[in-house]
Amino acid sequence: MFMGEFDHQLDTKGRMIIPSKFRYDLNERFIITRGLDKCLFGYTLEEWQQIEEKMKTLPMTKKDARKFMRMFFSGAVEVELDKQGRINIPQNLRKYANLSKECTVIGVSNRIEIWDRETWNDFYDESEESFEDIAEDLIDFDF
């Protein structure tokens, strides 16, 4: 399970260190792709296989299903950690997520997310205001 928030930098070659807390669970190779809210999603290879199976159930007769699958899968790339714990994020994904030098990597249960730091901070500030209301609307259990 992935959790936590970590600030890292993207170098001029598009490489970024993956937080050490995430490296063990991700293994040496994992998948990154376009996420929602202008971030990148990162999945273990095992989790990616499960997502692929779920996506196969989407009705291809639905235009939105086709659009979503095209965007999600065409952006997917297998990345490999180098000896310094970095991955190379392809230019098309850096552009999609508007990644600048300053990035934030967060853990979200079964995936990691890679955000431009300013975009993350804006999203966080906006979401923090409605956090309790969202919990009340979505969650039916105590914790």
UniProtKB/Swiss-Prot annotation:
Highest taxon listed in the record's lineage: Bacteria
Subcellular localization(s) per the UniProt record: Cytoplasm, Nucleoid
Protein's name in the database: Transcriptional regulator MraZ
InterPro entries: MraZ, MraZ_C, MraZ_dom, MraZ_N, MraZ_sf, SpoVT-AbrB_dom, SpoVT-AbrB_sf
Family to which the UniProt record says this protein belongs: Belongs to the MraZ family.
Keyword line: Cytoplasm, DNA-binding, Repeat, Transcription, Transcription regulation
Gene Ontology biological process: negative regulation of DNA-templated transcription initiation
Main location: cytoplasm
Entries under PANTHER family matching the protein: TRANSCRIPTIONAL REGULATOR MRAZ
All copies of domain SpoVT-AbrB, residue ranges: 5-47, 76-119
Pfam families, sorted: MraZ (PF02381)
Paired cysteines (S-S): none
Subunit structure and binding partners: Forms oligomers.
GO molecular function, one term: transcription cis-regulatory region binding
GO CC annotation: cytoplasm; nucleoid
